[in-house]
Amino acid sequence: LVVPLLAFLVNYIKTVQSKEVDAEGSLNLLNFSVILFSITTIFHMISSFENLLPILGITNFVNVITYGLIGSLVLATISLSYYLIPKLYGREVNYSRLEDITFFGFKISYLLLLINNTVLGVNSGYSWNAGANAGSPTIYGEGYGIVWSLISFNFSVNTFISLLLLGSGFLYLISVLRAISSGSITTVEEMVYSND
């Protein structure tokens, strides 16, 4: 995984450095999805050392990888749909404060989701591992109560992060519907390929 990730990142950085247009609107979200994918790939490489770090295979750390990969796919899809869906109706998105808030909401919620689940995975893994080494399993009984007191706050934070993600999705829906109904009209020349 290291060699493909390095090749991908080098090509991506060269492409970003050589672009002539500033990253505006949905292109900025697409760039963030690439960064999220890269971070998730690094987490995937770390989790492959399961024999060195046994806590990584049984905790929420595995969910970080899933959330990161799905998140990068969702953000890339949202970024492309901001261009494609209004174009199907002959419109385009006029980027405003609503789109900025939507993009910021998606970015911060996925970033917080990754950070919180990483902390949750490491905390629960070490406490479960410590309990097992001490001879008191933490899957049930008093040991479970101790572990739950360590990780319950993170699960509550996950709920609020999910609500932030839901709110960002609702703002995305409003933004796309607004672009379809009252966005700038795209001319036919922009939509049709010409041989000139």
Segments from the language model and where they lie:
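Hydrophobic cores of alpha-helical transmembrane segments in multi-pass integral membrane proteins
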Residues: 1-14, 28-51, 62-89, 97-147, ...
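Non-cytosolic membrane-interface motifs at loop->transmembrane helix junctions
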Residues: 22-26, 56-65
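Membrane-interfacial, low-structure loops and terminal tails that flank and connect transmembrane helices
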Residues: 19, 189-195
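Inter-helical turn/loop segments and adjacent helix faces that build the functional surface
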Residues: 15-21
